[in-house]
C-alpha cells in the first residue's frame, strides 16, 4: 500500500523538484499540499504550488495556503536564491485551478482525520504550518506517523554562520516540531550539501527529453547560478528538499544517526541554530533521526529514473 503523505512547502526550485519526485513515485500517495512563506512571499509560494501541479496535471490534489508570517517574527524571504517569482528560469503554466478556501492547518487536520492510517508530513520550508497544526490539534498527533523536514544542520549555516534558512525563518516553530514527541527525520545541510547536482547531471536530465525533465533541467540551470559563488566551494548545486522524498523512497542511500535536537531561539549569534547532541552530552533521549551522509550517485540516479515516469 502506498505511504500517505502531506507535503508542506515553499516553492522554491528544490521544493518544486521534490514535488516532481513525489508525484512520480507510486510508493507515495500525496494526500494534500500546503504552502508556507519562505523562499518567496506567501502569495507567490502558493501560486507556485498551483503552477507545478498544473504542469504535472494533478489538479486533483487538494491545496491550501498557510501562515503568512512566522509565529513570532517578521518574514524573511530568499528571493536572492529563487528569483522574483520563486521559480525563475523555465516558462511554467499559469494555475489551472484554485486552492481550497480553508487554511493549510485546516486542510492538514482534515486529511489526518479522514486517513485510515497515520500520515507522514513532509515539510520542506519553515515549520510554521506544522507547528500551528501540532498546537491546535493535539488530538491528531497520533495520526501523524512522522515529520520529515528539510532544515537545520550540525555545526553549519547557510543564512547565518550558525543557522540554516528554513529554521532561521521560524525557530520557535521548529522547536515546537522537534519537542512534539512525534518522530522527526531531519535532512539538514550536512546531507543536502552532499546531494549536489553537477552540470553533467543537469544534461542527463535534459536528455531524458520529456516536458517535465526539460523543466527540471531549466530550474536547475537557474538554481546553479547562485551556487557558483566560490564562497560555497560547491561543484554543483545542493538539492536540499528532494532529500526528504528520496529518504522515504530509498532510505538505504542515506546514513542517519538518532540524536536529540533542540533549536536556539534566543542567541545573539546562534538564533535558528539546530543544536544536535551528537555525543549524548545532555542526557536527553534522541528525538530525531538526523541524516548525515548520502550516496550522491544513488540520489542522482533516483531522480533520473523517476523523471522517466513523465514520458
Swiss-Prot record:
Enzyme Commission (EC) number: 3.2.-.-
A single MF term (Gene Ontology): purine nucleosidase activity
InterPro entries in the cross-refs: I/U_nuclsd_hydro_CS, Inosine/uridine_hydrolase_dom, IUNH, Pyrim_hydro_RihA, Ribo_hydro-like
Entry's Gene Ontology cellular component terms: cytosol
Domain of life: Bacteria
Active-site residue list: 240
Ribonucleoprotein listed as a keyword: no
Keywords annotated in UniProt: Glycosidase, Hydrolase
GO terms under biological process: nucleobase-containing small molecule interconversion; purine nucleoside catabolic process; pyrimidine nucleobase metabolic process
Protein's job: Hydrolyzes cytidine or uridine to ribose and cytosine or uracil, respectively.
Family, similarity comment: Belongs to the IUNH family. RihA subfamily.
Protein name (Swiss-Prot/TrEMBL): Pyrimidine-specific ribonucleoside hydrolase RihA
UniProt source species: Salmonella paratyphi A (strain AKU_12601)
Amino acid at each position: 500500500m502506498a505511504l500517505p503523505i502531506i507535503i508542506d512547502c515553499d516553492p522554491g526550485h528544490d521544493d518544486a523538484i521534490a514535488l516532481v519526485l513525489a508525484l512520480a513515485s507510486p510508493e507515495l500517495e500525496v494526500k494534500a499540499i500546503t504552502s508556507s512563506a519562505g523562499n518567496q512571499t506567501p502569495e507567490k509560494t502558493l501560486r507556485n504550488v498551483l503552477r507545478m501541479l498544473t504542469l504535472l496535471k494533478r489538479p486533483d490534489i487538494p491545496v491550501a495556503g498557510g501562515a503568512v508570517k512566522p509565529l513570532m517574527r517578521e518574514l524573511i524571504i530568499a528571493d536572492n536564491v529563487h528569483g522574483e517569482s520563486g521559480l525563475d528560469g523555465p516558462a511554467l503554466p499559469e494555475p489551472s485551478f484554485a486552492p481550497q478556501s480553508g487554511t493549510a492547518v485546516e486542510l492538514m487536520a482534515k486529511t489526518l482525520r479522514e486517513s485510515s492510517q497515520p500520515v507522514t508530513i513532509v515539510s520542506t520550508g519553515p515549520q510554521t504550518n506544522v507547528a500551528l497544526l501540532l498546537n491546535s490539534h493535539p488530538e491528531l498527533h497520533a495520526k501523524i506517523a512522522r515529520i520529515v523536514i528539510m532544515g537545520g544542520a550540525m555545526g553549519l549555516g547557510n543564512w547565518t554562520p550558525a543557522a540554516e534558512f528554513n529554521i532561521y525563518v521560524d525557530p520557535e516553530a521548529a522547536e515546537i516540531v522537534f519537542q512534539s514527541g512525534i518522530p522527526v527525520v531531519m535532512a539538514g545541510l550536512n546531507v543536502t550539501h552532499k546531494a549536489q547536482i553537477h552540470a553533467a547531471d543537469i544534461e542527463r536530465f535534459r536528455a531524458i527529453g520529456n516536458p517535465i525533465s526539460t523543466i527540471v533541467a531549466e530550474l536547475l540551470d537557474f538554481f546553479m547560478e547562485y551556487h557558483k559563488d566560490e564562497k560555497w566551494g560547491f561543484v554543483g548545486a545542493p538539492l536540499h528538499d528532494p532529500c526528504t522524498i528520496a529518504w522515504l523512497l530509498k532510505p538505504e542511500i542515506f546514513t542517519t544517526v538518532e540524536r536529540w535536537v533542540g533549536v536556539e531561539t534566543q542567541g545573539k549569534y546562534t538564533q535558528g541554530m539546530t543544536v544536535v547532541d551528537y555525543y549524548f552530552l545532555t542526557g536527553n533521549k534522541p528525538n530525531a533521526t538526523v541524516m548525515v551522509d548520502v550516496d550522491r550517485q544513488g540520489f542522482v540516479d533516483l531522480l533520473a529514473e523517476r523523471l522517466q515516469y513523465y514520458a
